[in-house]
Amino acid sequence: MAIPYLYTDYGEFLRREFPFKVQKISINAGFTCPNRNGEKGWGGCTYCNNQTFNPAYCRTEKTITEQLEEGKRFFGRKYPDMKFLAYFQAYTNTYGEVDEVIRKYEEALVVLDVVGIVIGTRPDCMPQALLDYLTGLNRRTFLMVEYGIESVDDGTLVRINRGHTFAETEETVRRTVDAGIRTGGHIILGLPGEKRDELVSRLPLTALKIHQLQLIRGTRMAHEYALHPEQFHLYTADEYIELVIDYIERLRSDLVLERFVSQSPKDLLIAPDWGLKNYEFTERLKRRMKERGAWQGRLADRREQTR
């Protein structure tokens, strides 16, 4: 049987949205998280070290405009006609006084060649006043709100110190989608003690980022691993490829998949270190999907047909 496609690709999604090439530029806008500052806990998520995904230009001593201009110079060398999405990535980018949060978004949007924004945040940090503003913003520019889901299991969410429940995720995702806003999610595969669950497929998300469990220096999870390594299963690249295929076969076929792995700096990464760049991993994943006769939604679509 011929396989019509393997998965719904993020690059294709962007090509449908824009008539030109676009690149996300990460921003550190000086936010924090409610599970870091004592409102809901201390220390943040047990797996998190924001240094793993902040480029060198993402420093809070620089303004949002300065960070974007540095990012534009970096990416624009290869594609002079490229446009950009301001990616509010570090920490919780809706957490703060609403007027101040809005000011930061508006600063990004007046930078030349910025054609939209992507906002990374938590499902328990979307006040209605801010969602009302974002509803209007969505009418005048490209907007995606990305929620850190990480797990659908409340026990796991407690263990990793997220400070919210999956029910809160469901409620906030639906509010955001009902407002007409493109809505993304992040999920971690391989968290300790967790079984695979496709509840995330029931959420009306536009896009999903999947990434592997990584042990990062300076995190509470790295300390837990040092004390109890038997509680963790660190996947080989081939094992993780099989896990990802099993997972995405059960996802909705129209859910845009932005990535399957994340990369951390070598000096911060404890394990697993596969020695693969993201594109190399993706090519191996595609090859294995073809070998298995697998595609996104294969089992999810079958379940829908039998209901």
Features from the language model and the residues they span:
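N-terminal [4Fe-4S]-dependent radical SAM core
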Residues: 1-85
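Auxiliary Fe-S-binding modules of radical SAM enzymes
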Residues: 2-12, 16-23, 207, 215-307
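Hydrophobic faces of well-ordered beta-strands that scaffold small-molecule active sites
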Residues: 23-27, 84-86, 117-119, 143-147, ...
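Core AdoMet radical
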Residues: 51-71, 79-98, 112-126, 142-169, ...
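Acidic (Asp/Glu)-rich catalytic clusters
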Residues: 75-79, 105-112, 132-142, 174-178
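Alpha-helix-loop-beta-strand connector modules within alpha/beta enzyme cores
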Residues: 111-112, 137, 167-185, 231-253
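Active-site glycine- and acidic-residue-rich loops that bind
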Residues: 124-127, 162-165, 192-202, 234-241
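Conserved strand-turn element in the central/C-terminal portion of the radical SAM core barrel
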Residues: 153-154, 176-199, 211-217, 224-234, ...
